[in-house]
């Protein structure tokens, strides 16, 4: 946490020291930076001022996350958890970044300059086409029709036409943040979809997803963690997809062998 741990005076404080930081954060299945993304998402959504301040400060002070990356995180978080919560989060980022700069002996400055993404041409139709392509690439399915403001301006024009295409975070990092957000949001379809495509795409492994579930459960509760765990268990990974295809092919071969030549529909047609 980039600060000295206080003495544990309650069962909660002892568990935070011994389990949360003594065990979970030290597990090798995710990098500390990956765990930061899950934790920042959870504390920002939990409306807990103290933990938000502490974890934003620790992420910046440790150097695990740079200020430009933190600001990209705020935008991605806003998409999936809403602008009001993200507005508060960005205010915290500003205050904690100023604190970090002062501690480093630097006069606090404003935000780093923003570059216009190379894909932004000002052409709305090009934005929509880019959004359709990004949606299909991220979600491994065709883009929806742009027949409502939510789908056209929101999903295709902004979420996938802009945010997911931005270079400030890797796609894998956006997956981690999104999985944590949809775990929070109590939306069954986005939860299943984003967990499934994160695994099927190969951006996250099953072992990494299991570690995300544990980190998430610690910071947003084991009840919601169970729902996220169930979604991960039900997801189709590249390995299970290959195993399923092999099993189906083997079963078909066995069936054909047992049926013999007379049982083949193709042979029946030739006769």
Functional labels for PLM-detected ranges:
Residues 247-254:
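D/E-rich low-complexity acidic segments and tails
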Residues 35-43, 73-74, 174-182, 212-213:
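Short, structured motif recognition centered on aromatic/hydrophobic residues
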Residues 26, 30, 39, 51-76, ...:
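A cross-kingdom feature marking solvent-exposed beta-strand/loop segments within repeated
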Residues 44-51, 183-190:
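Short, thiol/selenol-centered motifs that function as redox-active sites or metal-ligating centers
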Residues 156-161, 185-192, 196, 207-215, ...:
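Long compositionally biased, domain-poor regions of proteins
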Residues 1-33, 45-46, 50-54, 61, ...:
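Acidic, glycine/proline-rich low-complexity segments that act as flexible tails and inter-domain linkers
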Residues 81-83:
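Substrate/cofactor-recognition hotspot
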Residues 73-77, 92, 96, 179, ...:
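Short acidic/histidine-centered micro-motifs embedded in hydrophobic/aromatic stretches
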């Amino acid at each position: 946490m980039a600060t000295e741990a206080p003495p544990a005076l309650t069962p909660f404080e002892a568990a935070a020291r011994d389990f949360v930081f003594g065990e979970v954060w030290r597990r090798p299945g995710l990098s500390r930076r990956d765990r930061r993304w899950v934790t920042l998402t959870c504390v920002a959504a939990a409306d807990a001022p103290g933990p938000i301040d502490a974890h934003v400060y620790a992420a910046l002070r440790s150097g695990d996350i740079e200020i430009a990356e933190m600001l990209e995180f705020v935008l991605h978080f806003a998409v999936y958890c809403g602008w009001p919560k993200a507005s508060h989060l960005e205010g915290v980022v500003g205050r904690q970044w100023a604190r970090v700069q002062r501690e480093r002996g630097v006069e606090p400055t404003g935000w780093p300059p923003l570059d216009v993404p190379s894909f932004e041409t000002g052409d709305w139709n090009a934005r929509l086409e880019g959004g359709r392509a990004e949606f299909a690439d991220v979600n491994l399915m065709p883009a929806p029709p742009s027949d409502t403001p939510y789908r056209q301006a929101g999903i295709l024009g902004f979420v996938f036409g802009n945010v997911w295409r931005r270079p400030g975070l890797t796609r894998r990092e956006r997956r981690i943040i999104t999985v944590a957000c949809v775990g929070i949001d109590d939306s069954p379809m986005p939860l299943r979809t984003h967990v499934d495509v994160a695994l099927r795409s190969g951006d996250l492994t099953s072992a990494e997803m299991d570690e995300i579930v544990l980190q998430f459960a610690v910071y947003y509760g084991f009840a919601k963690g169970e729902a996220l765990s169930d979604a991960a268990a039900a997801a189709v990974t590249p390995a299970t997809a290959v195993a399923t295809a092999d099993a189906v092919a083997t079963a078909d071969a066995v069936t054909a062998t047992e049926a013999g030549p007379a049982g083949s529909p193709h042979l029946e047609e030739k006769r």
